């Protein structure tokens, strides 16, 4: 795990900037992008032509993923989708890779799990939804284990895994933030894992800056709204963000797109100092000990990694709620109910 401000973190920051334009570095990397694109196309073709067969796990699967590198808002989208499916009469479960955790076999994630053993995003999903959550690099194995343990589950939501073609899916939802496809180049010349033209059932765009939607078919706005902050040591203690406006505040985030979190706080009227930590930052020690501030605002995804040994009375957690377009929910429900039994 790269340290804050370390060489890897600086490289990540530079690539993120370069991926938003077609500069000299992007053009220099295009030969490698062509090789990457060819390999990705061969994998897609193998399943499209039937040379490889996806595995049907016996219930419909909704994949929430992205075609770009970095955070786009998938985790709050998964949480909102699980709640929406439950409200529509389904019994959803969730599978995830468990990125950042040492997971080799299908593993159940409960609210009492540790982030180091489950992954920060799956643990957050388990705590927020109460749905069965299983993790494994092999999402098919995770889905099969989930179904065996919870036979009442009638739909599985895959947190990421858009490129995990071995898992048969009924619906694919692709999430973008304001950066969309960046410079439009594939890795490593750009941020794209697959071409922007890749088929999907619907596109969700979270743009806290302009709110504009690209002219793509079946595209819906994704609104991420912060709630009242809760105290890390005393979760029942809550404060609206407006109460931090006249305090010395540091906002810190170890997520794929930390600037989006900072922009959310600014939109709420705050002017915090900011610190971008590497995605999935482990918090082996306290990086805030030398910060002379009254309050430190962090994300829920970071909060699940802070165990009982953490004692910093300045830490407040800012939850984020995703609001899904009712038309999108109706589209997903219609596709799920129209699926033929396996």
UniProtKB/Swiss-Prot annotation:
Its EC number is 2.7.1.130. GO terms for biological process: lipid A biosynthetic process; lipopolysaccharide core region biosynthetic process. GO terms for cellular component: plasma membrane. It catalyses: a lipid A disaccharide + ATP = a lipid IVA + ADP + H(+). Pathway: Glycolipid biosynthesis; lipid IV(A) biosynthesis; lipid IV(A) from (3R)-3-hydroxytetradecanoyl-[acyl-carrier-protein] and UDP-N-acetyl-alpha-D-glucosamine: step 6/6. ATP binds at residues 68-75. GO terms for molecular function: ATP binding; tetraacyldisaccharide 4'-kinase activity. Keywords: ATP-binding, Kinase, Lipid A biosynthesis, Lipid biosynthesis, Lipid metabolism, Nucleotide-binding, Transferase. Pfam families: LpxK. InterPro entries: LpxK (IPR003758), P-loop_NTPase (IPR027417). The keyword Transferase applies. Transfers the gamma-phosphate of ATP to the 4'-position of a tetraacyldisaccharide 1-phosphate intermediate (termed DS-1-P) to form tetraacyldisaccharide 1,4'-bis-phosphate (lipid IVA). Belongs to the LpxK family. This is Tetraacyldisaccharide 4'-kinase. It comes from Burkholderia cenocepacia (strain HI2424).
